Amino acid sequence: MPKRAAEDQKHPAETSSEDEYDESYLEEDSYAPDSPDDPTMEDDEEVPDTIDVDFEYFDFNKDIDYHAIGNLLRQLLDSDSTSFNLSELSDMILEQESCGTTIKTDGKESDPFAILTVINMSKHKDNKKGVIAALIDYFVARTQDLPELHKQMRKLLGPSSTSKVGLIISERLINMPVQVVPPMYKMLLDETKDQDFDYFLVLSKTFTEAETSVDEEDERPSKKNKKGPGYKPETYYFHPEDEVIQEKSTQYGSYAFKKASQEADSKRAFQEYGIFPQGHLMLFKAKDLEAIVAKMEVEFAP
């Protein structure tokens, strides 16, 4: 049975030409469109812009979700994912049976298309060889160019800190509609009320538009070249709900990944531009989660 039957929703799943995320755990053939040469296709047949999909909300399933969680974590951490023991992190997520939510479209035994959970970083930080300690060191190192956030990372996640910080992990396939997110956060709010967190730290991603080396090799004129020497690329959210979270955050900021990504050159995204992904952290007081959820429900109503 679904985790919250009342939360089951039908939404149009947006189709996308950008195959940005790794969906290797899915059967590619089952998602491949018919070939234009297929004689069964009519000449005037059009591919629909949206497809109605029933989304169901479930608890994490130890027997089914392990590999899909690993894939989604790799998407979230991008090119730096190889720096962490994602098997340990996946196991940690699955062990929290009463905390966190997955979204599936084909019943409990199918792979999740989205996950949301929180991990008590303060509980695991003293295990110096563990994945949480590695993430803490990573966050401290990557935020050195973000002084206020860096200061809070050292203060709240340091060895002598008594603050209880929950790491919120949220990731989904790129064509999942944002309207599925508020119910997940509402359930997380209910599930964490008795855990007495002081702060939540959201691990996410943003991106900027970056000119690709392929364009440079082709010597094509680029819009970016017309911006002038003082041009600073605009930052965009992968997850629209992050804008709501950021409004309530005490500190936040984007940071460059340690390992360079080839995503922009391989995808030729936005035609003349590539996508330059970067990590993003948002820190907010736990008491503000209720207000965040309330605004999400308004901003992203079904």
Curated annotation (Swiss-Prot):
Keyword Transport listed: yes
Amino acid composition bias (Basic and acidic residues), ranges on this chain: 1-13
A GO CC annotation given for this chain: nucleus
GO BP term, example: protein transport
Sorted UniProt keywords: Cytoplasm, Nucleus, Protein transport, Transport
UniProt subcellular location: Cytoplasm; Nucleus
Main location: cytoplasm
Ranges of compositional bias, category Acidic residues: 16-46
Region (Disordered): 1-46, 211-232
Family the UniProt entry places it in: Belongs to the BCP1 family.
Function comment: Involved in nuclear export, actin cytoskeleton organization and vesicular transport.
The protein's name: Protein BCP1
Species this protein is from: Yarrowia lipolytica (strain CLIB 122 / E 150)
Gene designation: BCP1
